[in-house]
Structure formats: structure tokens, C-alpha cells
From Swiss-Prot:
Protein name, entry field: Phosphonates import ATP-binding protein PhnC
Top-rank EC class of the record's enzyme: translocase
SMART domains: AAA
Keyword terms: ATP-binding, Cell membrane, Membrane, Nucleotide-binding, Phosphonate transport, Translocase, Transport
Gene: phnC
Protein topology in the membrane: Peripheral membrane protein
Nucleotide-binding is among the record's keywords: yes
Organism: Corynebacterium glutamicum (strain ATCC 13032 / DSM 20300 / JCM 1318 / BCRC 11384 / CCUG 27702 / LMG 3730 / NBRC 12168 / NCIMB 10025 / NRRL B-2784 / 534)
UniProt entry tagged with the keyword Cell cycle: no
InterPro entries named among the record's database cross-references: AAA+_ATPase, ABC_transporter-like_ATP-bd, ABC_transporter-like_CS, ABC_transpr_PhnC, MetN_ABC_transporter-like, P-loop_NTPase
Binding, ATP: G47, L48, S49, G50, S51, G52, K53, S54
An example Gene Ontology CC term for this record: plasma membrane
Length: 268
């Protein structure tokens, strides 16, 4: 992480204090997790499917509410917020989903402008009259992920990798203090997966943002992040520098030997 960028960016810390999440069906997705993410860190969250990775990410922006403990993001105790207070906090938390969540019939530009809704008068959003300031932010976000040339293209006409870059630009246009990415490279080919991860790395290095990314690919975690958080059956089982994480550490997180599907490699 670039310390100079961090000094000029309103990047937030994230703190989990004995957080548990139990779903209505009785499934305990998180079990007494205590964890602090420092401002400007680039963190990989790894674990098998069902380990609690997505739940952890979603408690940060209030999409999932902690049933025990507290989740604090910057100045906000997220699990206590409701209504406008929660919407305002979410306006500072960028979120990138595996499924892109784009409006396929709208242009790339219109999709990216959605990230400005929390900062813009409601009537402008309703009528589609963005301010000149919002337009410039959208253009800059698209340029930063290398897809400005597609600004007027319909989102549905893009490739999977291009759609994910638009999703990143949309999150960037929020001017966030935290960036969350939930399996952002799932189903992408190796070159595109590396491209998306470089975009996230650039956001961390240049913008100084706190970035948390859920990954199931060990080699990508090692190449692009600096800290590893491991979850197994909802419990925090590993937390340390990614440079110190051995194959045995990953096997302990997964509860099994490393398999080919855990590595991106050069597979098609």
C-alpha cells in the first residue's frame, strides 16, 4: 500500500468485535469473529464455500446484520444503523459483486453514475440530470480501470471482464472510504482475472483505499494482497501477512490438501 496515497485519502478502518451471524434457518455463518483491518490495507479473505466469507463482507455494509457483537466501519457502528443513516454510511462503502449487478440495457456511463446517487439530489437521479461534477467523476472512474472507450456502450454488450471493470468504476465513483469485493474474479479467464485484480491493487496503491477481497484462488491472493484472513466454518482461523502464509496454512484454513481448483494458474 502506498503510504503517500493513504495520507491524502479518507480511508477507513474496519473492526469486528466478537461478531456472530446466525441466519433464520439456524445456520451460524460467523462465530465470534474479532478482527481489525487498518486504513489502507489490502486484505484477502479466503475459505471454502460456506466458510462465512460473503457474510463477513456483507456485514461491513449492513447487507447482513450481526446478531451478536459490533461491526464498526470508520465512524459508524454499522449493525446499529437504520434508514438514512445506513444509506449514508453505505455511500462511503464501495461494493463489487461476483454477478456485476449492472443494468444490462443501460449504457456504461449510466451504470457508473449509479455510484453517485448517494451524493446527488434525488430529482437529478430521477430525471437523469447528473451534475457536471458527477460526470467528471464517472469519466475519471472509467479511465482509471481502462474502459473509458466503452462509455456509451450498452452494458449488456460487454464481456464478463469488461462488466466487472464497469462495476469497479461504479464503486469508485462513490468516492468511497472502503472497497469490498465479493469473489470478483469468479468465472473469469486468467488474463481477465489478473486484470481485475490489478485494478483493485491500483485502487489500494494509488487511491489509498482499504480493500477487502474474497478470493478462492491462492495464487491471486499471494500476488495481489498483503494480508490474509482465513475463515473456516464461520470461525477466524488465520490472520497474518500473506508473505508468511505457507501451503500448510492454506490447507489448515481449507481443512484439506490444496487442489488444482484452488489455483488460477493458466487454466482456460
Amino acid at each position: 500500500m502506498n503510504s503517500d496515497a493513504s495520507a491524502t485519502t479518507n480511508s477507513w478502518a474496519i473492526n469486528f468485535d466478537h461478531v456472530s451471524v446466525t441466519y433464520p434457518n439456524g445456520t451460524k455463518a460467523l462465530d465470534d469473529v474479532s478482527l481489525t483491518i487498518n486504513p489502507g490495507e489490502m486484505v484477502a479473505i479466503v475459505g471454502l464455500s460456506g466458510s462465512g466469507k460473503s457474510t463477513l463482507i456483507r456485514t461491513i455494509n449492513g447487507l447482513v446484520r450481526a446478531t451478536e457483537g459490533t461491526v464498526t466501519v470508520g465512524p459508524h457502528q454499522i449493525n446499529t444503523l437504520k434508514g438514512k443513516a445506513l444509506r449514508d454510511a453505505r455511500g462511503q462503502i464501495g461494493m463489487i459483486f461476483q454477478g456485476f449487478n449492472l443494468s444490462e440495457r443501460s449504457s456504461v456511463f449510466q451504470n457508473v453514475l449509479v455510484g453517485r446517487f448517494a451524493h446527488t439530489a434525488w430529482w437529478r437521479n430521477l430525471l437523469g440530470f447528473p451534475t457536471e461534477h458527477d460526470k467528471q467523476i464517472a469519466f475519471h472512474a472509467l479511465e482509471s480501470v481502462g474502459i473509458l472507450d466503452k462509455v456509451w456502450t450498452r452494458a449488456g454488450a460487454l464481456s464478463g471482464g469488461q462488466k466487472q471493470r464497469v462495476a469497479i468504476a461504479r464503486a469508485l465513483s462513490q468516492d468511497p472510504s472502503v472497497m469490498l469485493a465479493d469473489e470478483p474474479v469468479a468465472s473469469l479467464d486468467p488474463p481477465t482475472a489478473h486484470s481485475v485484480m490489478r485494478d483493485l491493487e491500483n485502487i489500494n496503491n494509488v487511491e489509498g483505499l482499504t480493500v477487502l477481497v474474497n478470493l478462492h484462488l491462492i495464487d491471486l491472493a499471494r500476488q495481489y494482497t498483503t494480508r490474509l484472513v482465513g475463515l473456516r466454518a464461520g470461525k477466524l482461523v488465520y490472520d497474518g501477512p500473506i508473505s508468511e502464509a505457507t501451503d500448510k496454512d492454506f490447507e489448515a484454513i481449507y481443512g484439506r490438501p490444496i487442489q488444482a481448483k484452488d489455483l488460477l494458474g493458466d487454466r482456460a
